[in-house]
Amino acid sequence: QVGVADAAPMLAADADLSRCRLYAVPSNDIWARDHGPITVHRDGQPVLLDFRFNGWGEKYAFELDDRITARLHESGAFGPTPREPVDLILEGGSIETDGRGTLLTTAECLLNPNRNGLDRAGLERRLGETLGFTRFLWLRQGHLAGDDTDSHIDTLARFCDSRTITCEPKRRSATPVSGKRCTISSVISLGYSTTSKILAI
């Protein structure tokens, strides 16, 4: 647990820290979105799924980041919520869900040999077992030049609700896409219901 001095910026902003706890753990990078736990509910109780993290396909050092969730749990940061290690590499930014069993993701990331080495059927089975997905929407477009994540879905398309997907139909020149785009038609081609909405932003 970190001392009050480490919370100086929040104190200066007059934030109420009465219910805040700060923990210091060694890390390689800042992307808690990708290496942090994913929470699921079982029998009405939360469970922290601690997937493996390998620095986006071993592009960067990752050993410390891969241990952060376990170290925080050992420090009591999550209270009584149980932690369950999952022997599968998965980043938080690589998956998008409507909360009703549908997964939206990219083949370029999740099926990349530098992650798990599983084929589509094998990965769908594992994700169904661990996260409860029953419907899988795979985008094959969307590679961004200079993107170290191998096309995380959270930069391409997001669920607004269970009937609405938001995506950018054409990327600006400042963020070039190497010959491929996440277009409205590519989302529709996944078989997403024609009664649903595809919003272009």
Task: List each model region and its residues.
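The feature marks the mature, well-folded catalytic cores of soluble enzymes
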Residues: 1-201
